[in-house]
Amino acid sequence: MINTLIFDIDMTLVDSLDACRVGANMMARNFGLREVTREDVLKVMTLTTREFWETLWGGFEPEWLDYFVHVVVPQVRHLSKMFPEAEDILKSAKKRGFLLAVATNRANPWLDLGVLGIAKYFDTAVGCTDVPRPKPEPDMLLTVLRQLGVEASSALYAGDSPLDMRCAAAAGIRSLGLTQSDATPGMLSAAGASAVRPSLAEARDVLGC
């Protein structure tokens, strides 16, 4: 029986496409790279940060990451907007007694949840700086399970990318794949999704709330 719901943030709970586009173009202007469009960003939303940059700009430099974390993220964080019904789903899940968590490749997820006004719903949140290895390695989800004292069999992870599905599979957790970014149902299923839905709003049957 599922009693723990774990969520990715980007393109799962929130539409962060504009935030990513603005952030990418801040990077482009600062480092003399090609500026990108919304369509460019949509095509790489489900990649890791390194893959995101390598696809857009053909490379990865350590100084980019430092600038991204310390300059870009604080300035674009407010541009992410909750998807319709996302907060209602969190509220409903909490009332039904579910434990709620976040596992994201963002750093400092509690700060993001606070900006979005939804930190109050979550029992724990784990980001890329809290574990040795980011997704698709299972470290984040295993950390969530350990912190909450729950078994993998009682948890479900919701995300929008094959990366999320592989992370869940590696942790032995069932997963819900959402086609809210650029991943197709086939891509999510091939990566191990237990169920696929177009959005959180259409996934209440899977979530149980």
Q: Where are the model-predicted features located?
A:
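Structural recognition of alpha->loop->beta junctions
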Residues: 118-128, 187-207
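Conserved Lys-Pro-Asp/Glu-containing loop-to-beta segment of HAD-superfamily phosphomonoesterases
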Residues: 2-4, 136-165
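Substrate-recognition/cap helix-loop segment adjacent to the acidic, metal-dependent catalytic center
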Residues: 29-31, 53-59, 79, 87-101, ...
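Conserved SAM-binding loop
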Residues: 13, 102, 133, 157-158, ...
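N-terminal helical cap/lid subdomain that shapes the substrate entry/recognition surface
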Residues: 2-98
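Short amphipathic alpha-helical segments
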Residues: 18-19, 113-116, 169-171, 189-190, ...
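Short acidic capping loops at alpha-helix termini that bridge into adjacent secondary structure
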Residues: 35-40, 120-124, 152-156
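Acidic, Mg2+-coordinating phosphoryl-transfer loop and its flanking beta/alpha structural elements
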Residues: 156-195
